[in-house]
C-alpha cells in the first residue's frame, strides 16, 4: 500500500511541481466563528472555553472544514493537509480534551479523504492526496520553560511518542496517503514524532511516505531550538522522507536563502509553504496572491522546488496564483549527494572520505576523568559543563559523555547533564556521543539530544538477536553507531579476528537491518601495550593493520577508538602517554582511522616528540624489537616532569611652534601620531563645537594628503600612516561629539567585504584606508562574508556603494552570485569589484551582465577614490557610467570575437603528446628522510634571509625591483622608509615572538596513472592513500608537449619507484589577532604592515623548506649552492606547484594534501569552504624532483577533459564545471 503511493507521488514529482494547500487557520478566521459555533450541540455544556480550538471543528463544523478543503482543491492543490495541527493529546490538554484526540484525527483525515476522492474522480489524471498532519505540540523537549532551571523539561520524549503514536494510527485509519510532520521548531519533538510514526508503520506492516517540514524562526537562520538548516536536515535524514521542507514563521523573501540551502543539501524532494509575508502591526499578513506568486515563480525557475504551498495568511487565491506561476516550470532535479556520515549538534558535522581526523573529546567521561567524576558525584553540574566546554574549545568536534560509575544513577545523571548541555550553545553546537555499557542509559541519552549523535557502543557479545534489536532502535532514534569488535567468543585481539567480527557485524547492519554503511563506526579494540606481557606486544600493530583491512573491505564504514587505552601502562606519566598517543595516532591515521576518543587539549604533535623518546615509543607501538618495553621504561622517568626610540633634534621639532591647524596638517601629511591627541584637544577647545575640528583642520589636512597621493607625490604606505593619525584624532573627539549629539557629513558610505570562502583582505584594507582618507565612511565586514550578510547590512546601513574583494578563483563565482542577488532583490547601488583574481574581462563578461546598475572593476587602491567620486556625483555619474558601459561592451565584443591564439585538441591527442621522458634509463631519487617532518615555531631569523622583497613593495603600490627600487627617483625614499619599518617589525617578531611560523612537509611513494598520481601509504606501494587529480594542457603544440604534472612522476607500469612531496607553511599564526588589535586602535598602517610581513614570511618559509628538501630531506641536490636571487629565479632542480595556481588550477586538490600531511591537526592551518588557506599568510603545494620538471599553465581545457576530470573525481558535471570554470574554453 505505502510503497505504491510513494512510487505514484514520486513519479508525479519528477514531472511537475506539486501544490500543497494553504492556511487552514486563516480560512477559519474568515468565518468569524463564535464560542457557540466551536461548541456545537455536542459540547454545548463543556466546562472550559473552546473558541480557538480549530481542530475540534472537524467534529462540530465538519461541513465548514470540508468547504475549505474543496476551495483549495478547486484552486489547484494536489495535497490536502488534515485539520489536525493541534490534535495530539498533549496539545488538546489545554481544553481538557485529550480523550478526543484519536476521534479528531480520524474525523479530520476522513473529511480530507472524501474531498480528495471527489476531485480525483472528476479528473483521474490529476490525483489528489491527503497528508495527515502532525504538528509540533505546545511543549519543547529540548528547551526548558523555566529560565531558572535549564535542565527542567515539561514534556518527555516518551510522552511525545505516546501522543504522536495515537494520532498517527487515527490519521492512517481515516485515509491519509502521507504523514506530514510540520512546523518543527524543536527537532527533538520531531525525532520523537518520527520515532512514533516508524513504530506505527512497523506495527501495521506497511509504511506511508513521510513529509518533514521545519521552521526557521528568524533572521538568525536557525530553528527555535538553535539548529542551522543543515544541522536540522542531518538530524532527521534517517527518516528517509519523500520530501524535506520549511514552512511558517517567515515570508518568502526571508525564507529564500534557507530553501536554497535545503535544495542544495537534500537528496530527496524539497517542499516549502511560507507565510504570506510577515505579520503587520495588527497581526495580519499583507502579501497578496500576485506578490507571493512572483516569489514562488523565481524559486521554481532557480531550481529550488518540488512542492509549494502556503502557511499563515495564505488562501485559495494564493494557491491558485502559485499554481499558475509554476505551471510549465521544471521541478528541481534530485542532486547526487556524496556518501558521508552527516552528524549534527546545533551545527552540522560531515565526515566524508576527504575529512581530516575527527577528535572526540573524552574528558566528559566519569571512568576516564577524575575531575569530571568528582563534579558529577558532587552534583556540581555547572562546573561539569565547563569540562565539556573546554573540550570543544580545545578542538573536540564531538564530545563523548559517559556516566557509568557504581555509585551514580547513570541514567538520571546522563539525562540531567544532556539537558543542561542543550542550554549551552558553545557545547551543544557539536554532536554528542552517548557512551555507556548499559542499554537503558544509551536509550535515555538518545531521548535527550535533538541532533544526530553517535551511540557508543553495541556489539555481538550477546548474540545476533540482541545486536539486531539494538541496531534497529538506534536507527529509529536517528543516530550513528560505534560497533565494538566483540562477539560471543570475546574481544578481538588479533588483526584477523578484528576484521572477521567487523565484517560479520557490517553485513548484518547493512544487509539485514538496513543501517546506512556511512553511519557504522567500528572500534576494533585498542589495547594497552608495554604491559610486560609478551602476548600484548603486537596489540598496536594489530589495530593499525586492521584499520587498513576494514577500510579496504567494508565500504563507507568508519574507524574510531579510545586512544588513551594504548598507553594505560604508563598512567601517571602523562608526557610519555601523550608521546605514545601521538605515535599511535600518526600510524593509525595513515591507514585510514577516521576519529578517536582523545583529550582534545592534550594532543601532542608527532614531530614534537623528542627524537630519543619517539624512537623508543615507535619500537613499542610497532613492536620492532624484543626489548622495546624495557628500553621505554628506562627513559620514561626522564620525561615525567616535562611535560625604537630616536631622539628628535630641535630642528626636527620646529613644526611644534606652528599654529594648531598647521600642526594637525603636518602630522597628517607626515603620519606623526606622537602629539595628535594633545593637538586635537587644543583645536577642540578653540572651536565652538567638536565637529568643527573634523570638518576644519583635520579634513583640510586629509585633503592635502589626497591631493598629494593623486599627484603621485605621496605613496600608499604614507597614506595609510596618515589614516592612522586621522583615526586617533577622531577617536579622541567622538565622546565629545556624541555628548553634543552632533552628526558629521561624509562623501558617502561604502560597504567592503571579502566574499564567502575567501580569507584574503590586504588589498581591501588598503582600499578602505584610502577611501577613509578622502572622507568616505567605511563599513568593513571582514573576510568570508556570506552574500546574505553583505546585502542585509547594506540595507540596514543604507550604504551608497558595495565593494567586493577576493583572491582565489572560486571567489569569482561568489561575486557573480552577489550580483545576481542584488538584481533579484532590487538593489540600485553601484558594485565595485577588486582583488588579485578579478579582471576587467571577467567583470564585463560574467558579473556586469547580471546586474542592471554600475559594476566597476577597480584594479588598485589609487583608482578607488576617483571611481567613488564619479559614481556618487549627480554631475559626473551619467558620463562615467556611459563610458564604463561602452568600455565593457568593447571588452565583451573583443572577448566574443577573440580567436584563440592556439588551436584546441582532443584530450586523447593531448595525452598522446605528453612529456617524453625515458623512464627506463632514469632512476628516481629515493628520499634520505621519507615521511612527514614538522617545523613548529620556526626561527624567523632564518626565514628573513629568504624573503623576496619585490612583492612586498607591490603590496604598497610601490613599483620597482628590490633592491634597485631604493634608487628610484620618485619612490626610492619611501621604499627605504617602508623597508626600515618592515625590518623593525621583523626584529620585534624575532625578539617577542609576535608571529609564529609553522610548517610541515612529507615525502611519499608515488606513481603516475594516466593524468593522475597515486600516492601510497608506505614503500610496499600496495595501498593507495590518495589519488592526486591533474589537468593537461589541451592546445595544439607543434614544437612542444602538452604538459601535465603527472608526466614528471614515473608511470606505475614502468616499475620505477618514484616519490612525491607535499608541504604546507604559514608565517601568519597570530597575524589576524595582531592586525585586528591595530585596527581597533585606529592604526591601519601597522595592521596592513603585519599582514604584508606575514605574507613575506610564508613565501620565505616555502622557499627555505624547498631548499632543505632538495638538499637534505629528499637530498637529490645535496651539492646545490644558490644565492637568494638565484632561488627567486628558480634556478634549482625540481618544482613546487601549488593547487589553485596555473599548473594545477583546481583548488579542491588542496584537500588530499591536507589529509596526507594531517595539516590542520598538526600545525593548525585550515581550509575554507572555497579551499582558501587559513591563516591567509600561507603557502602549500607539491614537490617534484625530476630534472625536466618545469612550471607551466594549463590555460583553457575542453569539454572532454571536464567530463574525464569529473568522472575521476567522482563529481557530477555541474560540480566539475563549478570548480573548473576559469579554465573551461568558452
From Swiss-Prot:
Key words of the record: Amino-acid biosynthesis, Cobalamin, Cobalt, Metal-binding, Methionine biosynthesis, Methyltransferase, Repeat, S-adenosyl-L-methionine, Transferase, Zinc
Binding site for S-adenosyl-L-methionine: 948, 1136, 1191-1192
Cofactor note: Binds 1 zinc ion per subunit.
Binding site for Zn(2+): 248, 311-312
GO molecular function: cobalamin binding; methionine synthase activity; zinc ion binding
Pfam families per UniProt: B12-binding (PF02310), B12-binding_2 (PF02607), Met_synt_B12 (PF02965), Pterin_bind (PF00809), S-methyl_trans (PF02574)
EC number assigned by the record: 2.1.1.13
Stretches assigned to the B12-binding domain: 747-882
Domain Pterin-binding: 357-618
CC per GO annotation: cytosol
Domain notes: Modular enzyme with four functionally distinct domains. The isolated Hcy-binding domain catalyzes methyl transfer from free methylcobalamin to homocysteine. The Hcy-binding domain in association with the pterin-binding domain catalyzes the methylation of cob(I)alamin by methyltetrahydrofolate and the methylation of homocysteine. The B12-binding domain binds the cofactor. The AdoMet activation domain binds S-adenosyl-L-methionine. Under aerobic conditions cob(I)alamin can be converted to inactive cob(II)alamin.
Similarity comment: family membership: Belongs to the vitamin-B12 dependent methionine synthase family.
Function: Catalyzes the transfer of a methyl group from methyl-cobalamin to homocysteine, yielding enzyme-bound cob(I)alamin and methionine. Subsequently, remethylates the cofactor using methyltetrahydrofolate.
Protein name: Methionine synthase
Organism the protein comes from: Vibrio vulnificus (strain CMCP6)
Record lineage: Bacteria, Pseudomonadati, Pseudomonadota, Gammaproteobacteria, Vibrionales
Chain's gene name: metH
Amino acid at each position: 500500500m505505502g510503497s505504491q503511493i510513494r512510487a505514484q507521488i514520486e513519479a508525479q514529482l519528477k514531472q511537475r511541481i506539486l501544490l500543497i494547500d494553504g492556511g487552514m487557520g486563516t480560512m477559519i478566521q474568515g468565518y468569524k466563528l463564535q464560542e457557540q459555533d466551536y461548541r456545537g450541540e455536542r459540547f454545548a455544556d463543556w466546562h472550559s472555553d473552546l473558541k480557538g480550538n480549530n481542530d475540534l471543528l472537524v467534529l462540530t463544523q465538519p461541513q465548514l472544514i470540508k468547504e475549505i478543503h474543496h476551495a483549495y482543491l478547486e484552486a489547484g492543490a494536489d495535497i490536502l493537509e488534515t485539520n489536525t495541527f493541534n490534535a495530539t493529546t498533549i496539545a488538546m490538554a489545554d481544553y481538557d480534551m485529550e480523550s478526543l484526540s484519536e476521534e479528531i484525527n480520524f474525523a479530520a483525515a476522513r473529511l480530507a479523504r472524501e474531498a480528495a476522492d471527489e476531485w480525483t474522480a472528476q479528473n483521474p489524471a490529476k490525483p489528489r492526496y491527503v497528508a495527515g498532519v502532525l504538528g509540533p505540540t505546545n511543549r519543547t523537549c529540548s528547551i526548558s520553560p523555566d529560565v531558572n532551571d535549564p535542565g527542567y523539561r515539561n514534556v518527555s520524549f516518551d510522552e511525545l511518542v505516546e501522543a504522536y503514536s495515537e494520532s498517527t494510527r487515527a490519521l492512517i485509519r481515516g485515509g491519509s496517503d502521507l504523514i506530514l510532520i510540520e512546523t518543527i521548531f524543536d527537532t527533538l519533538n520531531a525525532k520523537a514524532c518520527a520515532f512514533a510514526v516508524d513504530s506505527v508503520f512497523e506495527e501495521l506492516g506497511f509504511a506511508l511516505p513521510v513529509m518533514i517540514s521545519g521552521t526557521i524562526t528568524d533572521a538568525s537562520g536557525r530553528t527555535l531550538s538553535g539548529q542551522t538548516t543543515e544541522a536540522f536536515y542531518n538530524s532527521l535524514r534517517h527518516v528517509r522522507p519523500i520530501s524535506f521542507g520549511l514552512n511558517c514563521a517567515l515570508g518568502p523573501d526571508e525564507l529564500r536563502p534557507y530553501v536554497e540551502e535545503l535544495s542544495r543539501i537534500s537528496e530527496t524532494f524539497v517542499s516549502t509553504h511560507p507565510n504570506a509575508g510577515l505579520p503587520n502591526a495588527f497581526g495580519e499578513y499583507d502579501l497578496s496572491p500576485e506578490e507571493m506568486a512572483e516569489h514562488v515563480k523565481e524559486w521554481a525557475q532557480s531550481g529550488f522546488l518540488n512542492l509549494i504551498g502556503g502557511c499563515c495568511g495564505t488562501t485559495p487565491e494564493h494557491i491558485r496564483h502559485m499554481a499558475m506561476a509554476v505551471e510549465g516550470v521544471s521541478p528541481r532535479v534530485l542532486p547526487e549527494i556524496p556518501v558521508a556520515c552527516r552528524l549534527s549538534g546545533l551545527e552540522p558535522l560531515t565526515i566524508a572520505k576527504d575529512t581530516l581526523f575527527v577528535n572526540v573529546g573524552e574528558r566528559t567521561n566519569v571512568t576516564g576523568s577524575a575531575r569530571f567524576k568528582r563534579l558529577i558525584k558532587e552534583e556540581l553540574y555547572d562546573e561539569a559543563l565547563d569540562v565539556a566546554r573546554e573540550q570543544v574549545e580545545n578542538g573536540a568536534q564531538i564530545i563523548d559523555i559517559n556516566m557509568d560509575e557504581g555509585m551514580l544513577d547513570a541514567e538520571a545523571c546522563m539525562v540531567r547533564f544532556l539537558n543542561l548541555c542543550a542550554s549551552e550553545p558553545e557545547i551543544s553546537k557539536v554532536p554528542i556521543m552517548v557512551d555507556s555499557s548499559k542499554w537503558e542509559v544509551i536509550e535515555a541519552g538518545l531521548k535527550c539530544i535533538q541532533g544526530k549523535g553517535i551511540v557508543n557502543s553495541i556489539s555481538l557479545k550477546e548474540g545476533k538477536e540482541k545486536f539486531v534489536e539494538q541496531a534497529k532502535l538506534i536507527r529509529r532514534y536517528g543516530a550513528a553507531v560505534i560497533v565494538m569488535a566483540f562477539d560471543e567468543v570475546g574481544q578481538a585481539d588479533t588483526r584477523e579476528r578484528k576484521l572477521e567480527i567487523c565484517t560479520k557485524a557490517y553485513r548484518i547492519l547493512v544487509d539485514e537491518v538496513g543501517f546506512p554503511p556511512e553511519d557504522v563506526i567500528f572500534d576494533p579494540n585498542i589495547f594497552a601495550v608495554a604491559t610486560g606481557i609478551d602476548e600484548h606486544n603486537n596489540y598496536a600493530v594489530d589495530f593499525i593493520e586492521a584499520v587498513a583491512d576494514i577500510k579496504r573491505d567494508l565500504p563507507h564504514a568508519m574507524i574510531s577508538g579510545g586512544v588513551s587505552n594504548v598507553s594505560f601502562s604508563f598512567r601517571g606519566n602523562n608526557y610519555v602517554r601523550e608521546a605514545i598517543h601521538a605515535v599511535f595516532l600518526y600510524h593509525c591515521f595513515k591507514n585510514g582511522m577516521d576519529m578517536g576518543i582523545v583529550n582534545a587539549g592534550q594532543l601532542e604533535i608527532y614531530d614534537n616528540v623528542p627524537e630519543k623518546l619517539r624512537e623508543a615509543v615507535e619500537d613499542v607501538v610497532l613492536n620492532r624489537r624484543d626489548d622495546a618495553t624495557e628500553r621505554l621504561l628506562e627513559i620514561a622517568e626522564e620525561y615525567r616532569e616535562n611535560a625604537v626610540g630616536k631622539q628628535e633634534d630641535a630642528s626636527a621639532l620646529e613644526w611644534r611652534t606652528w599654529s594648531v591647524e598647521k600642526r594637525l596638517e603636518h602630522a597628517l601629511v607626515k603620519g606623526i601620531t606622537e602629539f595628535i591627541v594633545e593637538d586635537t584637544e587644543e583645536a577642540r577647545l578653540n572651536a565652538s563645537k567638536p565637529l568643527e575640528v573634523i570638518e576644519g583642520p583635520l579634513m583640510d589636512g586629509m585633503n592635502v594628503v589626497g591631493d598629494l597621493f593623486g599627484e603621485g607625490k605621496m605613496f600608499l604606505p604614507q597614506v595609510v600612516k596618515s589614516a592612522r593619525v586621522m583615526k586617533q584624532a577622531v577617536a579622541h573627539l567622538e565622546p565629545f561629539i556624541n555628548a553634543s549629539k552632533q552628526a558629521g557629513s561624509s562623501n558617502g558610505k561604502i560597504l567592503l567585504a571579502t566574499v564567502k570562502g575567501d580569507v584574503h583582505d590586504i588589498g581591501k584594507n588598503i582600499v578602505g584606508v584610502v577611501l577613509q582618507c578622502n572622507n568616505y565612511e567605511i563599513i568593513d565586514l571582514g573576510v568570508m562574508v556570506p552574500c546574505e550578510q553583505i546585502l542585509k547590512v547594506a540595507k540596514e546601513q543604507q550604504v551608497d556603494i558595495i565593494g567586493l574583494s577576493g583572491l582565489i578563483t572560486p571567489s569569482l563565482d561568489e561575486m557573480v552570485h552577489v550580483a545576481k542577488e542584488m538584481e533579484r532583490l532590487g538593489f540600485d547601488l553601484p558594485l565595485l569589484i577588486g582583488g588579485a583574481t578579478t579582471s576587467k574581462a571577467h567583470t564585463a563578461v560574467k558579473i556586469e551582465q547580471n546586474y542592471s546598475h554600475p559594476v566597476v572593476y577597480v584594479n588598485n587602491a589609487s583608482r578607488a577614490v576617483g571611481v567613488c567620486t564619479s559614481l556618487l556625483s549627480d554631475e559626473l555619474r551619467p558620463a562615467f557610467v556611459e563610458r564604463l558601459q561602452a568600455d565593457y561592451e568593447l571588452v565583451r565584443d573583443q572577448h566574443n570575437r577573440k580567436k584563440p591564439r592556439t588551436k584546441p585538441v582532443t584530450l586523447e591527442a593531448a595525452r598522446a603528446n605528453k612529456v617524453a621522458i625515458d623512464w627506463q634509463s632514469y632512476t628516481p631519487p629515493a628520499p634520505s628522510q621519507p615521511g612527514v617532518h614538522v617545523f613548529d615555531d620556526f626561527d624567523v631569523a632564518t626565514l628573513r634571509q629568504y624573503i623576496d622583497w619585490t612583492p612586498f613593495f607591490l603590496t604598497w603600490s610601490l613599483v620597482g625591483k628590490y633592491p634597485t627600487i631604493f634608487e628610484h627617483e620618485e619612490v626610492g625614499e619611501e621604499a627605504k622608509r617602508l623597508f626600515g619599518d618592515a625590518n623593525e617589525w621583523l626584529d620585534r617578531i624575532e625578539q617577542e615572538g609576535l608571529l609564529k611560523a609553522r610548517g610541515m612537509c612529507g615525502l611519499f611513494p608515488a606513481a603516475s596513472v594516466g593524468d593522475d598520481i597515486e600516492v601510497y601509504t608506505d614503500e610496499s606501494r600496495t595501498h593507495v592513500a590518495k589519488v592526486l587529480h591533474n589537468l593537461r594542457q589541451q592546445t595544439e603544440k607543434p614544437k612542444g608537449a602538452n604538459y601535465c604534472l603527472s608526466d614528471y612522476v614515473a608511470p606505475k607500469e614502468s616499475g620505477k619507484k618514484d616519490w612525491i612531496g607535499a608541504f604546507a607553511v604559514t608565517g601568519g599564526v597570530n597575524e589576524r589577532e595582531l592586525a585586528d588589535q591595530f585596527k581597533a586602535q585606529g592604526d591601519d598602517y601597522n595592521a596592513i604592515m603585519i599582514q604584508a610581513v606575514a605574507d613575506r614570511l610564508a613565501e620565505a618559509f616555502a622557499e627555505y623548506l624547498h631548499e632543505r628538501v632538495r638538499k637534505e630531506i629528499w637530498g637529490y641536490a645535496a651539492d646545490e649552492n644558490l644565492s637568494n636571487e638565484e632561488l627567486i629565479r628558480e634556478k634549482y632542480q625540481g618544482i613546487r606547484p601549488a593547487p589553485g595556481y596555473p599548473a594545477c588550477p583546481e583548488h579542491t586538490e588542496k584537500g588530499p594534501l591536507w589529509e596526507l600531511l594531517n595539516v590542520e591537526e598538526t600545525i593548525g592551518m585550515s581550509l575554507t569552504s572555497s579551499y582558501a588557506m587559513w591563516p591567509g599568510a600561507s603557502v602549500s603545494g607539491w614537490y617534484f624532483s625530476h630534472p625536466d620538471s618545469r612550471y607551466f599553465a594549463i590555460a583553457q581545457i575542453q569539454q572532454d577533459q571536464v567530463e574525464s576530470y569529473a568522472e575521476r573525481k567522482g563529481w557530477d558535471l555541474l560540480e566539475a564545471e563549478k570548480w573548473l570554470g576559469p579554465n573551461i574554453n568558452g
